[in-house]
């Protein structure tokens, strides 16, 4: 499904929170949306493998990487795993790598930057917790909509037909 965050903001201005414009699109989908699962991990993507192995139909993984752009949390392998398990998208408050490969995948991926250095994979982090970045607080179960213009968040799903 295609999402237009500008139009959604016009219609649902009272119901949505707008994430500060810190992100760029690195995935093959220009827009994506769904119910979010949150994870907090700093320069370590081990936990992301476990989460992305789950069925992601209708879901978006929101990763609070502390805003670090020193190491990439999402790589092509994680992107392919997410596509295989039908995730709608990934938002990374941090960096990604292997961007040419990510761009070929049928998934939305928004991140702050790209860097060739990979993350540790010790599995350090927490999931299903409140995370805050870009001027917005994210809770697992909220609904996120993203396109090349921006990212918005709503507590309930928006009627988009």
UniProtKB/Swiss-Prot annotation:
One of the protein's GO biological processes: negative regulation of RNA catabolic process
Record's subcellular location: Cytoplasm
Domain of life: Bacteria
Self-association and partners: Homotrimer. Binds to both RNA-binding sites in the C-terminal region of Rne and to RhlB.
Matches recorded under PANTHER family: 4-HYDROXY-4-METHYL-2-OXOGLUTARATE ALDOLASE 3-RELATED, REGULATOR OF RIBONUCLEASE ACTIVITY A
Similarity comment: Belongs to the RraA family.
Protein name: Regulator of ribonuclease activity A
């Amino acid at each position: 499904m295609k999402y237009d965050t500008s139009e959604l903001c016009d219609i649902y201005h009272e119901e949505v929170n707008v994430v500060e414009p810190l992100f760029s699109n690195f995935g093959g989908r220009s827009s994506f949306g769904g119910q979010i699962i949150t994870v907090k991990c700093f320069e370590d993507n081990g936990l992301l493998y476990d989460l992305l192995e789950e069925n992601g139909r209708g879901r978006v993984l929101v990763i609070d990487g502390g805003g670090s752009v020193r190491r990439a949390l999402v790589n092509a392998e994680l992107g392919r795993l997410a596509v295989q398990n039908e995730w709608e998208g990934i938002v990374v408050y941090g960096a990604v790598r292997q961007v040419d490969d990510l761009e070929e995948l049928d998934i939305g991926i928004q991140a702050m930057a790209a860097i060739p250095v990979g993350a540790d994979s010790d599995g350090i982090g927490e999931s299903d917790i409140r995370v805050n970045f870009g001027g917005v607080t994210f809770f697992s179960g909220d609904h996120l909509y993203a396109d090349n213009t921006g990212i918005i968040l709503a507590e309930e799903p928006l009627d988009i037909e």
